[in-house]
Amino acid sequence: MEILVLNLGSSSIKFKLFDMKENKPLASGLIERIGEEVGQLKIQSHLHHDKQEVKKQLFIKDHASGLLMVREHLTKMGIIKDFDKIDAIGHRVVQGGDKFHAPVLVDEKVMQEIERLSILAPLHNPVNLAGIKFVKTAHPHIPQIAVFDTAFHATMPDFAYMYALPYELYEKYQIRRYGFHGTSHHYVAKEAAKYLHIPYHKFNAITLHLGNGASVAAIKDGKSVDTSMGLTPLEGLIMGTRCGDIDPTVVEYIAQCANKSLEEVMKILNYESGLKGICGDNDARNIETRAKKGDKQAKLAFEMCAYRIKKHIGAYMVALGRVDAIIFTGGMGENYPALRESVCEGLEKLGIALHKPTNDNPGSGIVDLSQPNTKIQVLRIPTDEELEIALQTKRVLEKH
């Protein structure tokens, strides 16, 4: 069985083609800067006999043009003989709202719901839907499955997902906390339980997905019971360009003081804040280098980021009662030892203690970063959202 996973962003397409007999990728690729003057195309074959790679810089008009390039290169590179022979396509869809608590086979009703939910994810759901529509038009017989970022968090209790706003706002407009990065949190939690030989339905963990977008999840008995993101991905941790938790009155105050419209203020909070807002850069590598050289703003940004993560760990330890593991994943969580060290520093009395030599040089794959005989295991686990989407796609396909 061959499954193609598509992850369409506002100006990008990320994809992986899997052979589901062994859950191994046959090819992967990334198309970036769609709609800009010079776009980028990168496709890599993972076939044992042929590890060829294609890199191009060219104008890519829109997502449909990008998807045509994906189809063309998968066949031209000999990765697949016929695109129509793909068994299914799994789509990452960011917002599933109250409607979708699990992956679903796409039909007209599902497409209408994804479009309706675009008001909650205006940057993501419309392009996710564009990918679905492209496949439906070009290859109508290929089954498509939508896998929702929010679905894993559908198990949160109402006292965790509700905002203390007039209840009618929830009833009329579904204003509540949904959470995101669910596919990643789910994947690394399953991998951790397997690694620690704990039955997943008895596994308690705090998962830290730390990248340019970042979130924490509290997982109890294998289910999400709380997470840091809310109605949108703006809530929670300090991120690359997003502010995370702030006093809501700040929005009105900025608008008045700086003479900004609501739209302009929201742009500041989403694209000009977070690490970038504090030190002018959202690249963790640059920030770490600058901080080591004594740059005060870079040091402040780093400390603020780590402190916010640490506060969420403490809160979720209380929510869970028992914690088997703390799991670092995502670009920053996997690759920046200094951030992991700063987050775990001072938590020894809670049973969290890093083994510094291992943390500094963890190697590849799943790594136990904790000191021997500590109460809570600290793990570094590379996430694989595409594989998790492929696995969920396969399960839905087998049911139908």
UniProtKB/Swiss-Prot annotation:
It holds the Pfam family Acetate_kinase. The gene is ackA. GO terms for molecular function: acetate kinase activity; ATP binding; magnesium ion binding. The active site is at residue 149. Its cofactor is Mg(2+); Mn(2+). It catalyses: acetate + ATP = acetyl phosphate + ADP. One of its GO terms (cellular component) is cytoplasm. Coiled coil: none annotated. It is an enzyme of class 2 (transferase). Belongs to the acetokinase family. It is found in: Cytoplasm. This is Acetate kinase. Catalyzes the formation of acetyl phosphate from acetate and ATP. Can also catalyze the reverse reaction. Its main location: cytoplasm. Homodimer.
